[in-house]
Amino acid sequence: MKKIAIVILALLAIGTITQAQCRAFTKNRVLPNLLGYIQNENYNAALFMEGDESEVLMTFYGGKNYRLVVMGHPVLPDVEFEVLDTNDELLYSNKNAENKTVFDFRMANTQQLKVRVKVPDTGGTLVHQGCVTIVAGHKE
Amino acid sequence: MKTKILSVLMVVVILAGYMNLTSCSGCQKTKQDQPAMDNKKDSMDQARVEQLKKIFFNIPSPVEMASLIKKEGFSYDKKLLNKVESVDTYMGEAKQAVNLGIYGADLSYASIFDQKQECMKYFAAAKKLATAMSIDGGINDSIVAKLAEQQENRDSILKIVTSAYADLNGYLKENNRVEVSALVISGGWLEALYLSLTYAEKSNGSAIKTRVAEQKMVLENLLNYYSSFADRPVLNEMKSDLLAIQKVLNQVEITAQKTTVTKADDGVMVIGNGGKAEMKDDTMKALMDVVKQIRTKYIS
């Protein structure tokens, strides 16, 4: 019984460590890109596999400058991201900007925008899995 | 005894290897393993999509509301904030989480107005709550020490506060306490709304009133997020409170046209749809009444 408890505890600890790697990736690799901007307090990072796609609806205030950073772990192919309005009108795609991970923009008025993120499927023999993080920062 | 410990460790190592294959931050799996999983692929994909919905969520930070209050020329009012002395009276995870968010918004407000001593007090209260809730990430002694060192630099304090709360949010999400994270964010939003409403009432037709009206959109994001959690009792009370606020905010009229993308003189992309949020005075009064009532319930 004691042994089982030890195994379970050890596994829980390992699970936490592996999940925490996304937080470390975000802190060390992603957040330095927000230099000069005040970081948004929401945390958006998760493990993605090739072919995975996700979307987040965000509200941006009018008159402010924003920076959006979308980055994937280097083991993944270049992460694609798009910014769309609520009618699904495409406003920006990093595919048209040499797969840049940073997008700077200014809001003329307050508006909800969607950020769609995709890890392309390379079709290779190996299926890669890694952290993908979306962070936003603002400045006046 | 040694053999027993070794055999237990071996099991741990083997299972850890398996877990690393499924959940490391950057790793590979061979596609040879996939056919056996194909039958379950659709349901697994759906489960992953649902899981991602619970992680990927974003609303503006309370600091954005606080900075507008300062920009509009208003002064700091300590009396508006939740008392730090109340921290020991908050029992139960839901109430503690909401107040952790409320203290976070108060902290942002104090930071924007350069209230360094107040920041230290509010950070200490937030840390106390985080400790009571067994949250080790984000708010800890090292952050408190960092904050003490940065007493003279407002931007650094702001950076410490926002990154501490973002890290706390990340810690909760990574430790399967996503509901607690939702409550912390809701508490922060509620407090920022309360502070903005107080200033909006003092002013006449200011930008703050418009910003309050725009919370109709932010609340829609927040409630969408709540709908990704299937019947979690810990969220029920806050969800019904948010719905009560939404009932009033639904009276706000938002007009918008087609979104345009232009380039400013400095080369930055400008996005806009000419949207305008308008709120009548009686709606603002009704909003203040309901927000005050809900806030009082959580802070007392």
Model-predicted regions and their roles:
Chain A
Residues 4-14:
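Sec-dependent N-terminal signal peptides
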Residues 21-23, 46-127, 138-140:
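Acidic, Ser/Thr/Pro-rich low-complexity intrinsically disordered segments
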Residues 20-37:
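Predominantly extracellular/luminal regions of secreted and cell-surface proteins
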Residues 129-131:
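"Short basic amphipathic alpha-helical interaction patches in structured regions
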Residues 28-32, 95, 133-140:
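Extracytoplasmic/periplasmic copper-protein system
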Residues 14-20:
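Sec/Tat signal peptide C-region and signal peptidase I cleavage site
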